[in-house]
Amino acid sequence: MSTGGPQKLEAQGGKEGKEWDDGAEHDGVTKIYVAAGGLGIEQIRFDYVKNGQPKEGSFHGVKGRSTISTIEISHPAEYLISMEGWYDSTNIIQGIQFKSNKHTSQYFGYEFLGDGTQFSLQVNDNKIISFHGFADSHLNSVGAYFAPISSSLTTTPNKVEAQGGNGGETFDDGVFDHVRKVYVGQGESGVAYVKFEYEKDGKRETRDHGKMTLLGTEEFEVDSDDYITSIEVSVDKVFGYNSEIVTALVFKTSKGTTSPPFGMVTEKKFELKDGNGGKLAGFHGKASDVLYALGAYFAPSTTSTTPSTTKKLQARGGNGGASWDDGVFDGVRKILVGQGNDGVAFVTFEYNKGSQAILGDGHGKKTLLGTETFELDYPSEYITSVEGYYDKIFGVEAEVVTSLMFKTNKRTSQPFGMTAGEHFELKEDGYKVVGFHGKAGDLVHQIGVHIVPIFTNYRVAI
């Protein structure tokens, strides 16, 4: 291994076509364009940053009638660490997938089913800074240049001082990748309790502080493609406490969403915000039986590598239960639906991410009636629409989902539940379902979907 400069990994695939080389003088990759067609990957292009300046790359291959999909990488906090794929006897790249230090892209082209040659471009403790290969009418091969991951890429989060009083015990949740949900519980005089749902390396973690009262909690959920940019903290001196306490919280996001005020807004307000436009990454402060003070960590904002064509269709049903969101995957493998006496009591979904089958969390509550399963012939089969009904049932304040039915590119499932009430359909022509979200308590109150364009082709043995 050379230590004097970038390391060049040999191109994988066929050597047909014209050799291309984007050069090894870049700092990193900022954008990827991929067109996948009937015979494999038709065309690819990479944009770079060089000496801090953006540099557009060239297209390699020829795009037919396929759609170009893009991946954006937020340099320098995010960088590519690997590219995986495969090619067959035609010596054309059939499928590829990219991984960064923060995300894994959707799979482009045909997924590997065992007939062909797989490859992986990766060097430990290095990042991809450029690509090379061969291409003609299609992408025949691809290789990469690697450089060590500079310590300068590791940015120190900005810790914004806690605002409020001096009472209570100090807490510090630390720094996470995302803040997904905030729960705020009121007391008689101010904010008595907070709970934060974080995400780090794809896993959810919660931290709570203060003491919950009989008033319960209110919640503010952040969409998967959004993040909190500021928190307004109201504080006041309240009878019975030796120092000021937090009386209200208001959250604002990068997409312009503002939460309702959680608590009593006062004239004395502070704003927790990063001067560099960063995103909220964690909380610290002081609490005991109430929240005395709140501060925050902010980290550089990053752009998700989920293709920008991903859409989130609004959930349908009643406004009950707690919000949930499984996020975006490559596809759906299996659906389990559990019935209750009056509606859908429980759902869980098995997804595919890269080469892994991932079982999502259960939503709702299983009953003695058990669950029914709808299994897809993944990857050649995918969900194109979700239909169902929701209705008001005795003893439950908000409407519940009473029936679900799933349509794929090959067939339609049986109806799970009772087809009564208000009908709905979650569908967009030319798109497939790659994730679910909704609301649930003891029953499923709402169901919604994440969708992406159907541009991936799957090879099926005949």
UniProtKB/Swiss-Prot annotation:
Region (Disordered): 1-23
Basic and acidic residues bias spans: 13-23
Pfam family, one: Jacalin
A GO CC term attached to the entry: nucleus
Keywords from the named record: Lectin, Repeat
Tissues with expression: Expressed exclusively in flowers, in male and female organs, petals and pedicels. Not detected in pollen grains or sepals.
GO molecular function, one term: carbohydrate binding
InterPro entries reported in the protein's UniProt record: Jacalin-like_lectin_dom, Jacalin-like_lectin_dom_plant, Jacalin-like_lectin_dom_sf
Expression triggers: Up-regulated by methyl jasmonate.
Cross-referenced PANTHER family: JACALIN-RELATED LECTIN 12-RELATED, JACALIN-RELATED LECTIN 3
Entry protein name: Myrosinase-binding protein 1
Organism for this UniProt entry: Arabidopsis thaliana
Gene field: MBP1
